Amino acid sequence: MRFSTLHFAFLATLSSIFTVVAASDTTTCSSSKHCPEDKPCCSQFGICGTGAYCLGGCDIRYSYNLTACMPMPRMSTFQESFDSKDKVKEIELQSDYLGNSTEADWVYTGWVDYYDNSLLIQMPNHTTGTVVSSTKYLWYGKVGATLKTSHDGGVVTAFILFSDVQDEIDYEFVGYNLTNPQSNYYSQGILNYNNSRNSSVNNTFEYYHNYEMDWTEDKIEWYIDGEKVRTLNKNDTWNETSNRYDYPQTPSRIQFSLWPGGDSSNAKGTIEWAGGLINWDSEDIKKYGYYYAHIKEIYATAYDIPNDVKLDGNSTKESDYHAFLYNSTDGDASNIMLTTKKTWLGSDDATGFDPQNDDEDSSSNKAQETTITSVSGSSTITSVKTDSTKKTANVPAQNTAAAAQATAKSSTGTNTYDPSAGVGGFVQDSKSTDSGSSGSSSQGVANSLNESVISGIFASICLGILSFFM
């Protein structure tokens, strides 16, 4: 049985995008229950809130109203190689990001580092791993990545396109099977166990491979090392029951993740698909303190958008329409508009209908001074310097119930994980890095173990699991 990345990869990283609140304050959202006005934004995990809840992953279908979610920054053609420590440091902590995509091309929750000319994504002992997301959205294009997966039963690596209404195009790699990458797709989160296909390569852990997804209005093609391994035609996805094409068709972010599909807290079917219970006493855990995967390069070619797309704005300059916006909660391709509206929030209490971003000097963090220090990738500004008044979003670290377990172990002195230890002995001076950089691994641990989020973790996990079965 095959299970969706939506329900499990992101369930395993439940707290990565939105604010964790006390269990008594948690408000859920679904097709039968929309968010209230004071917590108007429905996260992709079915939890209502403000601030970061209204950014990437905000589901317009179940939010308070259509304007609760912020516009989605538009992606241009780019190429990025993580071939230096500075490139990895440009990846911004999710908790520092409030929607200004000129500030960073990538955000992360969990643990990232630089090693051997690559971005190293990590999953420490008894944690839920790491998610790296683009800050911009692609609406049709060709996306490719050169990577080495993790390994061992229960360990899952993923490279996906994922939209806010839960359209999804995947490459997934289960660690017990290193020769059969899985391609997959979903439309608006609808589970279909027949969508997955296997391909054949040599060892995905030992060797770099190039994986591509070529997404157009009419078809999706998957490639490995330049060879086409699968084609999906839109016409073959017609659903007579719903009277629509079950085909990914909405603007999507690029995401990489490393997560414990075989964690004992997961459903039995998830554990079986992932290759059994994860071994938290493995050689990698003993030697390094974490499982890991390498991302060497990522690139995207943005295709022309559909000719009949509507415009939300008065400008006659195409370049001013820098973001996508929905005009209906149906969430189909015909409901996508281009807009000139800002994509960032002024504070973590802001929402799409009250963004608090009228000040032209506002960035993703209100009351801060921003200075451009470098350029790279798909955006003009990828590295910034901010003053001490910087305000961060209430986004918790990349952990759930498993992290709470790790916290308990840490208090007894048995958890000796050092996220900056690096594979092969690379050690980074985390004390000298800024908390907004990917090199701040010690800060990431501090965030991960923050006592203020633990009270909401268990409730969030339970709600996420319940939402899957409903």
Curated annotation (Swiss-Prot):
A lipid is attached at residue 440 (GPI-anchor amidated serine). Its EC number is 3.2.1.14, 2.4.-.-. It holds the Pfam family Glyco_hydro_16. The lineage of its organism: Eukaryota, Fungi, Dikarya, Ascomycota, Saccharomycotina. Residues 409-418 have a biased composition (Polar residues). GO terms for biological process: adhesion of symbiont to host; carbohydrate metabolic process; chitin metabolic process; fungal-type cell wall organization; growth of unicellular organism as a thread of attached cells. GO terms for cellular component: cell septum; cell surface; extracellular region; extracellular vesicle; fungal-type cell wall; hyphal cell wall; plasma membrane; side of membrane. It catalyses: Random endo-hydrolysis of N-acetyl-beta-D-glucosaminide (1->4)-beta-linkages in chitin and chitodextrins. Residues 370-384, 392-408, 433-446 have a biased composition (Low complexity). The active site is at 168 (nucleophile), 172 (proton donor). Residues 347-446 are annotated as: Disordered. Residues 95-282 form the GH16 domain. It comes from Candida albicans (strain SC5314 / ATCC MYA-2876). Disulfide bonds join 58-69. It is found in: Secreted, Cell wall; Membrane. Glycans are attached at residues 65, 100, 125, 177, 194, 198, 202, 235, 239, 314, 327, 450. Keywords: Cell wall, Cell wall biogenesis/degradation, Disulfide bond, Glycoprotein, Glycosidase, Glycosyltransferase, GPI-anchor, Hydrolase, Lipoprotein, Membrane, Secreted, Signal, Transferase, Virulence. This is Crh-like protein UTR2. Chitin binds at residues 172, 259, 270. GO terms for molecular function: glycosyltransferase activity; hydrolase activity, hydrolyzing O-glycosyl compounds. Belongs to the glycosyl hydrolase 16 family. CRH1 subfamily. CDD domains: ChtBD1_GH16, GH16_fungal_CRH1_transglycosylase. Residues 441-470 form a propeptide. The keyword Transmembrane does not apply. The GPI-anchor is attached to the protein in the endoplasmic reticulum and serves to target the protein to the cell surface. There, the glucosamine-inositol phospholipid moiety is cleaved off and the GPI-modified mannoprotein is covalently attached via its lipidless GPI glycan remnant to the 1,6-beta-glucan of the outer cell wall layer. The gene is UTR2.
